[in-house]
Amino acid sequence: MNQKVLQTLEYDKIKSQLSDFLSTPIGRQEADALQPITDVHIINYWLQETADAMMIDRLKGGIPLAKLADITPHLKRLNIQASLSATELAEIGNVLRNTSAISNFFIQMKDESIGESLEVLIEQAEQLETLPEVTKSIQTAIDSTGRINDEASYELKSVRGKIVGHENAIKNKMQEFTKGKTAQYLSDPIVTIRSDRYVLPVKAEYRSQFGGVVHDQSQTGLTLYIEPQAVVELSNKLSELRVKESAEEQRVLQELSAELEPHTNEIQQNVQILGHFDFVNAKARLAARLDAMQPTVSVENHISLRQAWHPLLDKKIAVANDISLGDSYKTIIITGPNTGGKTITIKTLGLLQLMAQSGLFITTRQPSTIGIFDEVFADIGDEQSIEQNLSTFSSHMANIVSMLDHIDDKTLVIFDELGAGTDPAEGAALAIAILDKVASLGAYTIATTHYPELKLYGYNRPETKNASMVFDVETLQPTYQFLMGVPGQSNALAIAKRLGFGEDVIGAAMALTDESDQDLNNMIADLVAQRDEVKKNNEELRSQLKATEEKSEALSEEQSKLEKERAHVILDAKNEANHIVAATKKQAEQLISEIRKERLRAGQRGELTEQELQARKGKLDQLRQNDSLEKNKILQKAKKVKELAPGDEITVRSYSQQGTLVKKHKNGQWEVEMGILKMLVDEDDIVKTEATVKAQKGKAKKKQQKIIRKTTSSGSTRASVKSSLDLRGVRYEAALTELDRYLDTAVLANISPVEIIHGKGTGALRQGVTEFLRSDRRVKSYHFASANAGGDGATIVELK
């Protein structure tokens, strides 16, 4: 990628923001070296790294990296068997401790099942070499500040103990001189140190009376710093102990350096991985700062930026726009007056493309797609170029000439005010010729111009689309909204009229205007009016659709309520019938018992035998209502009052789904069509829908009939399936399982579109739903809901 376009599109300013989040030298080196690349596999890998890091940032606050020093020079010295200083060893020890901490961090995430959602960072963490024995040796011997600990060796601890003893003895002896008779010889009753020896500040005139060794004097010469003769021997012994301490410290450092030397390659690998984690952390935190999203990469170079804004603008006030290029057209011509936002629009497309090819998330409010370009060229106008000043026509042309030598079908070209800076007629002609040349080379182009001659360019060139920036004539202010398909409209006369010019001036101006220009402006005005009308109608349709869905949901709830009431009525009726039968049976048994007793007393045999009496009792038993509706033959027979016939609307009891009878097979089974499915069903498993309706009485019957009349052609199954699924508050795995089950039900009921409500929250569930829908074959398309319908807290799904 050429370096000029990185400067022109302010790519380095994005990298500068990235550096705000870095804490390691290797991470900074990686950020400094960041460039757009063209390998789609590496780009997707980098984007997935950023996605993993964003998930860790949301769930754990990021990868817990400490600030690390650059230990690469230390490792090079170890490779030549040099002995490192305590500070250098402490810095290596800090890296090793961080290595262990990061390794344990990812192991814990894996144990918590979070690691299953991390596609690449877990694998990188598994390459860390923790070196526990070496880490422990350094941690025992040297603290984080570079001081050698007493526990570094037995000898060092012993020598330091003796040093402390001698220092205390010397201090006690010196304190005696600050009191009593000798105190009068001192400038101040304090003990100080000169040349590593304990001394007292003695007045110069008492030098002979005090005695001892003079080590220093004050600037005035009035005070001498004298070591009393009584502590000279102790001080000499203390110096000897300090020499031993230094020798032992050096031995410890040499021993630790020798222990580290075989592991320099592993430590260097750890440094690289930790630095890369620092860089990935920074990418995630930059994405969070910018409120950026992960783009999809299109190898066909189909760019679709949905609700995109320039990442260097304040996202709270920036106007987001939809920009598409490369699908049905490869050239966009943005016409219209200056100051309307044309330049920032083309810069947005160019910079977001560079960011995505660098593995960075892009500033869009809805899922978007970027291409893969070997080169991106940009010729940006002078007054609006932030970093580059190309002020003359010749410099623009020289820049474009250099581009043409490198343009092919894998190039994105950005022109700002193409052909400006010269005679308008010649400039417009040259602009058209340049655009034709670039198009013949197969490049993808987005260009801005204020030449009216180019307004017709998009209509008579293949794979070319007109566009413009919306201008509010009422407020005389640009809206910065990007409008595809409509060329820029000249508003000069309309603005002049609103500002107070009389009809005579406006009329004279119109008379001087070329008639074809007036016709073109009128045509553009008509297109804009039609577009506004379509937009208004779409909003009304969306509002009506939402109201219809709400009514459908209410009707579905009412139907469910009626079905429950019906079930209660049937249950109460069955209980009452069973009660009557039980009472009748009891009376019959009493009657039979009396007959038997009477016959026994009379010793007679009547015509009514014992078997006949039992048979009559059995008939009474059969009157009892069966508790299981599926096994109750009387109720089943009642449900099949009419003969089944093809075309009948029926209910399959085992599936609780409605369908239509197609034909009856020889084996007695019926072929039933339920939504997009067809299956064979036993006749006993089929209930006519009309029997269900007729079983209801009174007010419940009327309400049920009204519901059935108002449901759509897909029947009661469609009405009972809601057009939305609320996953808020549901755990991640359970939510995806529920989503899969819901899509099955919606497809079976032939419902589309449907709304998946996942909320905003941390964004983990939203990302999970998006990934699920992207790979699901049942999904035709999906997008976030409109801002007034939940925004990115809900996803609208079109099913196949």
UniProtKB/Swiss-Prot annotation:
An MF annotation (GO) of this entry: ATP hydrolysis activity
List the EC numbers from the record.
3.1.-.-, 3.6.4.-
Q: What does this protein do?
A: Endonuclease that is involved in the suppression of homologous recombination and thus may have a key role in the control of bacterial genetic diversity. Acts as a ribosome collision sensor, splitting the ribosome into its 2 subunits. Detects stalled/collided 70S ribosomes which it binds and splits by an ATP-hydrolysis driven conformational change. Acts upstream of the ribosome quality control system (RQC), a ribosome-associated complex that mediates the extraction of incompletely synthesized nascent chains from stalled ribosomes and their subsequent degradation. Probably generates substrates for RQC.
Q: Which Pfam families match?
A: MSSS (PF20297), MutS_V (PF00488), Smr (PF01713)
Q: How does it assemble?
A: Homodimer. Binds to stalled ribosomes, contacting rRNA.
Which residues hold ATP?
Answer: 336-343
Keywords assigned by UniProt, alphabetized:
ATP-binding, DNA-binding, Endonuclease, Hydrolase, Nuclease, Nucleotide-binding, RNA-binding, rRNA-binding
Gene name tied to this protein = mutS2
One GO BP on record is:
mismatch repair
Q: Origin organism of this chain?
A: Leuconostoc mesenteroides subsp. mesenteroides (strain ATCC 8293 / DSM 20343 / BCRC 11652 / CCM 1803 / JCM 6124 / NCDO 523 / NBRC 100496 / NCIMB 8023 / NCTC 12954 / NRRL B-1118 / 37Y)
Q: What is this protein called?
A: Endonuclease MutS2
What family does the database annotate? Belongs to the DNA mismatch repair MutS family. MutS2 subfamily.
Give the Smr domain ranges: 725-800
